[in-house]
Structures are given as structure tokens and as C-alpha cells.
Amino acid sequence: AKAELNTLFCSPIAWLILIIFAFQAGLTFSDLISDQLRYLALNYRPYNLTSALLLGYSGVYSSMQDNLYLYIPLLTMGLMSKEYSSGSIKLLYSSPITNIQIILGKYISMLVYALILVAILFAYFIYSACIVENFDFPFALTGILGIFLLVCAYAARGLFMSTLTAYQVVAAVGTLTVLAILNFMGNIGQDIDFVRDLTYWLSLAGRSDKFLHGMICSEDAFYFIIVVVLFLSLSVLKLKFERTTANSLSKMVQYIGVLCVTLLVGYVTSQPKLMCYYDATATKANTLTPPSQEVMTKLDGGLTLTMFVNLLDDNFNKGMPKNRNWEMRKFEDYIRFKPEMKMEYVYYYDHTDNPRLYAQFSGLSDKEIAQRLCDTYDLDFNMFLSPEDIKKVTDSKGINLEEEGNRFVYLFERENGQKAFLRIYDDNQRDPRESEITAALKTMVVKSPQVAFITGHGERDIYKGGERDYSAFAKNLTFRYSLINQGFGVSVLDLKADSMATDIADNIDFIVIADVREAYTPDVIAKIQRFIARGGNMIIACEPRRQPLMNPLVENLGITFMPGIVVEETEGY
């Protein structure tokens, strides 16, 4: 290793890479500092500076990570290639050292060089710690660890490629090619179950991003270790086969054996039940909030997440096999606390509210449209259940997808039979966030707060979508912030028609009285007062000039709506 380091630093390439690396890092960091000073001059309040300067989307660590693949092949291309081209490989073979010692010596020299690169980045760590108040040390150190592991993985790949050829340029190009293939690997065969899992694990893309986000996951840490051991083992085998006589079958068996062991270890370490996590951020930004964690601890027993994917819905592509790994990543934080959670998919076609699609295929039946879409997207039509078949499936589960508009929807099912829908929304983000996911799960472990909207006296309607009405606020399935999507149960209560009942039902937690247009009778007011007296909650909204109608409802609470309207005059209006 020492001799290799001496040789490495006798080459101008090693020094040139260090200079360019330091220059790029310094240029990036100075730009980031300038941006923060500019924000301060504009009286903006800086926040999360540890991430902004070092680990964010444009932070110095993130920027330099994106350039590493350009540097490492230039360093590794001569590790073994120069031995072949100069003939010194014969001296190595004749010396009293083993193949493992040769490869480890070469690799350790690259580890030392990697530490030098990391030391350059560590200088910005120290400077940031001096100028940033409440600097997040574990967060920043985790990012440095991720970059170091990435360099180690690149170096192992480069070393293996250099054992394959005596031409350094070919070794460098080969290393770049392998890195490109491994980065693209995650997009290969995503429609096939076994191939999807295999290529997704082999993919290098995004492996160090979690470290830059402050999360250490055992799966990613083991990935780097396994990949390093894999390519070092392949390098040792390559030297072994050059020094000994072995037939092609024997070589192939040994290479395949190393690959199989690697994949087996990778499969085991990627199992959710065996994965460990450490969130290094001070705010635990990569971890579910404590209320969400509390909900997950109460979800004892099995839990299944089923995705119902309607081919005729605009969002059907989210549930296609090629996107399953992406869908799993959405629920990764929940799988961390519920590793036995299963994910299932049900594909079907049925009529839904999709005017654009029906206008495009005017005059065709739902089945014909589904067949056209399968031909267009190269899908197997037989994987989609017919409306009759999906009806049998939903009936067996005790759910009704027609009430959901036959849209793309998630269904959580507990082992004890409890169920909860989770929806996607008609906004820019579409996917549910933690608040919506936890709200859906919470309905299965605690009683949902029940909100009753009082009707019968001209109040605002939760079934109408006008400006005056409360559809979006209360029951709109596609609006993220509607009560029904935030874990509330919503109903209407006509106290005028319900004159026979003596009291409001005990399961009601809130009543909403909005913009009454007809006076309440004494009996109705008495019901409301008894509801409040037993601990019920009331939300009341009064429009101007409705004070005489609303005051009888609140006078017993010591509240009175005053006559008139408060107006603040604005110049020019």
C-alpha cells in the first residue's frame, strides 16, 4: 500500500485531481456563503444552515458527490493496468505475496486517497461549525460518511476494471461504463417482479443520498460494504486465474458463486425486519413524528396495504408494476416502524370520472377503452379485472369502490378486519403526506372524531360545491385538507326533521352550525344546549345581518353577536 501511494503521488494526475476537487468545493462553498449573506442583507431569516451550506440540494457535499464519478476512474485506471503494460506484474507474481495482498495493497492506497478527499470536505465542516449557530454536527458527519463510502465503492469497481486490461484508457472508460450501468440499473426490468427487486438492489443511484439527508440505514451501509467485497473478490479471482491453470467452467462456477453469495447477503440485509436506522438530524426530520409513532405502536397484528388501480383513472400509472419500488418508498418511514407490513395490488377497469379519456375515446365502451390503453402502454389486458370481477373482490372485503369514484385508492387492512381508505388528491403533489397517512391509520386504533353539520334551517351544505357551501371542507375525497381525509367522520344532522329524538346522538363530538337563515325552535335550541352541557363541542359561524337568528344559540354561553359590520377603510378602494 505504501509503495502504491508513492507511485500514485508521483503521478501528476493525483495532484491535479486534488487541486481541481479543492477548487470546485471552494467555489461552490463561496457561492453558498454569498447567497446566505445576500439573504441576510435582504432581512430574510436564515434557517437550516447546516443543510443549506453542506448537505442540501445545492450544498457543497451534494455538489461534490455528483462529480466523484469523474475523478475516481482517472485514479484507478492504472492500479493494475500499468503493472500489465510495464511487465512488472511478473515481479509481483514471483514475490512472496498472495493475490489478496496485492489487491488489498492497491485498494488501501485508494482508501488513503479517499480520506484525503474527505479531509478537504472536512475543512468546510469545521468552518461551517464555527460560523453557524446550533450547527448540526451528527447530520454533517453523516454526509461525510456517505461520500467516503461512495468513493470506496467507486474505487473497488475501478480496481476490478483495471485488472481486466493493460490499457489505462480502456480501464478508465470501462469504469465509467460500469458506473453508468449501475446508476441506470434501477430502471431495468421494473415490470418483472424478480428482476425488479434484483436490479433495484444492484442500482447505485441514490445510495449515498440518505446519508446526505442525515439518515444512516443498515441496508445502504451494507450495500457499500457488499459491493466493495464483491469487486475485490472478483479482482482476486482474476489474478488467481492468471497465475493458475483452470478451465472455463471452473472459472465461471467461481465467478457465479461470488455473485450468488453477494446477492444472498444483499437480499438478507435488505429485509425490512432486519434493517436498522439512525436519524442523525437534530430535528429527526427523517423520522415519523411522535404522534405518528404512537399510532404505529398501537397497530398490533398484521397490516396490509392494498392498492386498487383502475386503468381508466388518470392516476393508474402510479400503481403499475414498474413503479412499485417508488410506491414502497412513499411508505418507507412507516415500514420502518411496521416492517411486517405487506403491499398488494389489485388491477381492474371500471367507469370513473375521467372526461378527458372518454372524450379521447368517444363512442367506445369501458372494456374497449381499457383494451386500447393496454395496447398503447404494452400492458397485459388479462391482469385487469372486469367490473363484475372487481365487484366480487370488493364485496368479499366489505368495501365499495364506487363510493370512492373508482379512483386510484389505497386500503389499509388490519389482521382484525379493520379497514381505512387512503386517497390521492387533485393538487400538485397528489401523493398523501404523513398527516394524511397517519390520519387514515389512526382511524383503526382510536375512535374518529365525529362532526355533524346541522341542516334544516338554511345552513351551508356539505354536499354542494358552491362558494357558500362546505363540500371541499367536509367531504371532498380529492381535497387533501377536507375533514374526511384528516381522520374525521362527517355526517349531517337535521334537527328540524329529527324532532322525535330527545338528544343529539352520543357518538357526535362536534356540531357545526353555519349561517342559519331560519330561526331555531325552542326544542331545537334545547337539544343543542343539552349537547354542549354534556361536553360536546360546537363550531358556529354567523354571517352579517344574521345576528338575530344566531344569538339564541349562544346567549346561554355568555356570547352575543353584536349588530353591524366592522369595516376598515382602505385608501383607494
Each model region followed by its residue ranges:
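Hydrophobic/aromatic residues in alpha-helical transmembrane segments
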Residues: 72-76, 124, 156-157, 235, ...
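Transmembrane helix boundary and interhelical loop/hinge segments in multi-pass membrane proteins
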Residues: 73-93, 107
